[in-house]
Amino acid sequence: MPDAVGRELPRDGTVLAFDYGEKKIGVALGNFITREARALTILPNITVEGRFEAVAALIQEWNPVQLIVGMPVNPEGGEQPSMKLARRFGNQLNGRFGLPVEWVDERYTSRAASMAGARRGELDAEAARIILQQYFDQFPL
């Protein structure tokens, strides 16, 4: 099953998705077989070293074949300042862990997470879940 630019996507395996924020990073987990995402955790984003130590622990635990990063796009579809940070985070994930990274438009995911009933302390992980579910839904089997 090819992605938007014709690359072959994995057909099985675990996927981790990230909702990158300057203070917190929401994380979700899913797999290509069930194509269902679930909120996993929220990582503090205080230092670069701490951020990637926490991500490394998740990668070691879940052994993903693909990483997804939410791309913050403004309502009109244009770039906003946090987009550059999310793109850099995704590129660093690829460089540090050698795993393929895909970006998903994360417009309104925090609002959707709130409307879905996620509590305040769980919003970032729920937003990551929505990002990952959008990714799965974008490429039906």
UniProtKB/Swiss-Prot annotation:
One of its GO terms (molecular function) is nuclease activity. The keyword Transmembrane helix does not apply. Pfam families: RuvX. InterPro entries: RNaseH-like_sf, YqgF, YqgF/RNaseH-like_dom, YqgF/RNaseH-like_dom_sf. Keywords: Cytoplasm, Hydrolase, Nuclease, Ribosome biogenesis. Its EC number is 3.1.-.-. Gene3D superfamilies: YqgF/RNase H-like domain. It comes from the Bacteria. The keyword Plastid does not apply. It is found in: Cytoplasm. Disulfide bonds: none annotated. One of its GO terms (biological process) is rRNA 5'-end processing. GO terms for cellular component: cytosol. Belongs to the YqgF nuclease family. HAMAP family: Nuclease_YqgF. Could be a nuclease involved in processing of the 5'-end of pre-16S rRNA. This is Putative pre-16S rRNA nuclease. It comes from Cupriavidus necator (strain ATCC 17699 / DSM 428 / KCTC 22496 / NCIMB 10442 / H16 / Stanier 337).
